[in-house]
Amino acid sequence: DAHDNETLYDLGVLKLPKDTTMADRVRMNTLSLATVTLSQTPSFWHAGTELLRSKSLDRNSYNSGDWFNRIDWTGQESTFGSGLPPAADNQAKWAVMQPLLADPALKPGPADMAAAEASALDLLRVRGEVPLLRLGSADRIEQKVSFPNSGAGATPGVITMLVDDTVGADVDPDLAGALVVFNASPEATTQAVPALSGRSFTLTSAQANGSDAVVKTTTWDAATGTV
């Protein structure tokens, strides 16, 4: 998300199934931020997105004033449900917005915002810890980055990315590669990359010591190249 259009959390309110749990909404927020943070490019996060920032579904808050643009940096109060956003760019969707904004199940609590922030900060630590996730050159990216298991046979909702430092000039003196799996599906996934059999992969220390218990269940089978 950015300053234009809905915030990332508000997009989830509009696009995810209405019965999606708040815990899964937090995970989707983290996953969405991960696709930016771990994808080589300079990362751009909208202010407050790590706290599930809401503008009450306002898609253009430039002239909406402090009421719709405010952020509680203490993480104690979500601004979701502050009222119907101004008519200028939103009135056509008021009928859709009104019941959503009135639903207390869609308003994050302090614990939800804290979980989202902790997971988001873990992502920044991962990016800082692994130089291979910020190669800094289009030529290096083209040379070292690939997407195993992509194409027609890809698992729906899952993207596997390999940054292979055994190809070309060495970038990271400590790591020979970085393997990233983005799983937007509702189920746990297994990805086999036979070409990586015999190589060793472990969670970064930021993940192994981080806030996400699900991420910590990740395993690597070197014999088969399966994560």
What are the roles of these predicted feature ranges?
Residues 1-179, 184-190, 198-199:
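Loop/helix patches that line or flank the sugar-binding groove of alpha-linked glycan CAZymes
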Residues 186-227:
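C-terminal beta-sandwich/jelly-roll accessory domains of carbohydrate-active enzymes
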